[in-house]
Amino acid sequence: MKHSIAILLLIGLVSVGCRNKGCTDPLSPDFDAKAIKDNGSCTYDGRLIIWFDELSSDNMENLWINSLSVYVDGSLVGTIAVDEWTNGQPNCSNGGGVRATVNTDGADSKLVQYTVQDDLGFTIQQGTVTVSNSNCAWVEVVY
């Protein structure tokens, strides 16, 4: 009988211990407040926001450009109509522009390449930008 109780207690402790594994880093979007032991599941994301102002919008519209496509590291992350300009740099959490989530692969930051093309496929602007985890980076398209 004593052995049965000891075995049941041991099983209970093991099962509770298994449930307390997860991401223990509060800077990660995968953070689990109940986790006691880190299991390597933390990821780190930053945001890249590509935006333009009214003057650039007017200049593009005058040349019959209707929309822009934004690529980050060669992948399309969004399109935006040229009349969707913002008055100044957009807010990190909401607002205008094309927004891309960048996984920094556990590093503090990641250097990414961006390309902005018009609706005919011509490159309007391209470059590299450093995106930090849990932060925003902005690129203004000037046309």
Kindly label every feature range from the protein language model.
Residues 2-3, 12-49:
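Bacterial Sec-dependent N-terminal signal peptides
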Residues 4, 29-32, 77-78, 121-124:
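Short, intrinsically disordered, charge-biased short linear motifs at domain edges
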Residues 30-32, 49-52, 100-101, 143:
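Extracellular/mature segments of secreted proteins
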Residues 51-61:
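Short amphipathic, basic-aromatic surface patches that mediate peripheral association
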Residues 60-68:
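Short coil-to-beta strand junction motifs in C2/discoidin
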Residues 71-106:
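Tryptophan-paired
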Residues 103-119:
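A short tyrosine-centered beta-strand micro-motif
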Residues 115-143:
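Structured interaction patches on ligand/partner-binding surfaces of diverse proteins
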